[in-house]
Amino acid sequence: MEIPFPTLSVALPDSSLIDSKSLLEKSLRVAQFARALSIFRVEKVYVYHDASSTVRPDDAKLITLLLEYLDTPQYLRKLLYPKMKLLQFAGMLPPIQSPHHKKFLRASEIRGEESRAGVLLRDRGKWVVDVGLDRTVPFVGKTETTRKANFKLSVKQGQ
């Protein structure tokens, strides 16, 4: 029997990067935060401005962007994040290996039902989902997002 984890939220001040001078140092520090947040299965992170300190105005944006980037499975990162200066060192950061980060698979390796993070795409007039398989899979259902979402995959009998 699996014991459910309680919902855990964390508030993170933008001043947590005040001692880091370079973008590389800041990126590495945020990666450490992401790893700790993943280990303790934190579900929500609130980044807030610490008015009592003199922080750079883009530090909160950097923390938020890097945490979202690191929370995205590796197979979706190129689709969701264009090249930008704030992500200059993101490729050097270690993956956080979160439970919802699934490995790349062949579609034939899916057994039963599986939940995977993916992105809804339009391909030749039809909706398909990129969920880190060797091919996109047809999308059945309704959605209002083309950003990252969780999708339930199920294999039909005989496939």
Regions found by a protein language model. Give the residues of each.
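Post-transcriptional modification and biogenesis factors for structured RNAs
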Residues: 1-159
